């Protein structure tokens, strides 16, 4: 009987401890380590948004399709938003695609469609990415285990 009482008391207090735990993901900045370039790299990361053990991740793309350097902090334009399997710029990527929201005439050339942005208008978290481009289009991404929820605001 005493063991049962102790178990109930322990269970009661342990749930209170878990209820007070902080949401640590709010402190994660996925832009950390993105100040990389081919000559000298400071982290070799890109601001990936994805679920743990997901099929793929999602990221803003400042580099060209097919290059390993998907995102570089010093670059001030976005060429698209891409699905990725890449774990490091040195490993490159495979079976990826990118897209770019726009208005007006369709522009397929990634250099011509690149749009300027400011890091002041960018939020990069593991579970959410948002950027407002200088042309006024806002892109938001929230990952799932097999894809991503996208929202474009014009």
What do these predicted ranges mean?
Residues 20-154:
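Accessory carbohydrate-recognition regions in carbohydrate-active enzymes
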Residues 4-13:
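Sec-dependent N-terminal signal peptides
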Residues 15-19:
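Sec/Tat signal peptide C-region and signal peptidase I cleavage site
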């Amino acid at each position: 009987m005493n063991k049962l009482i102790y178990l109930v008391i322990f269970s009661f207090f342990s749930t209170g401890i878990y209820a007070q735990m902080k949401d640590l993901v709010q402190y994660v900045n996925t832009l950390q380590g993105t100040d990389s370039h081919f000559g000298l790299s400071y982290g070799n990361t890109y601001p990936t948004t994805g679920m743990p053990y997901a099929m793929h991740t999602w990221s803003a793309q400042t580099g060209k399709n097919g290059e390993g350097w998907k995102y570089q902090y010093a670059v001030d334009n976005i060429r698209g938003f891409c699905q990725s399997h890449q774990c490091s710029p040195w490993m490159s990527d495979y079976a990826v695609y990118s897209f770019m929201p726009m208005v007006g005439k369709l522009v397929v050339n990634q250099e011509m469609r690149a749009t300027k942005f400011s890091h002041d208008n960018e939020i990069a978290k593991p579970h959410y990415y948002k950027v407002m481009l200088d042309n006024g289009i806002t892109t938001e991404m929230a990952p799932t285990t097999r894809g991503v929820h996208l929202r474009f605001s014009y």
